[in-house]
């Protein structure tokens, strides 16, 4: 289900927000900019939060979790409006996204990180419901 969600988010962003130049899984990417292989910006990193599971009667499990979308753009004085507009385009693209093993993607929270000198990081947190069939 996480792989399906990741691929669905990636495909939807590539289709609806072509300005995004790099999409990957989150691994504290912005904390080690000088140490990592450079990636093109604007970039999106997808982070999974904890999923809590409840059994369904005899046919799988239903889960609830969070997915955080990290939008990373270059920082330039007065350019925050473009980053916020790009964040809005991402919301319009992935709000309500669904698949065979997930649905109900809904924006819950938005944060802006001011902890970096050369980049701006906007983080949107979405609620998502998962379905896991029994093996």
Locate the predicted segments by residue.
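Charged, amphipathic alpha-helical segments and their flanking helix caps
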Residues: 1-37, 45-135
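A solvent-exposed, acidic/Ser-Thr-rich amphipathic alpha-helical stretch
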Residues: 42
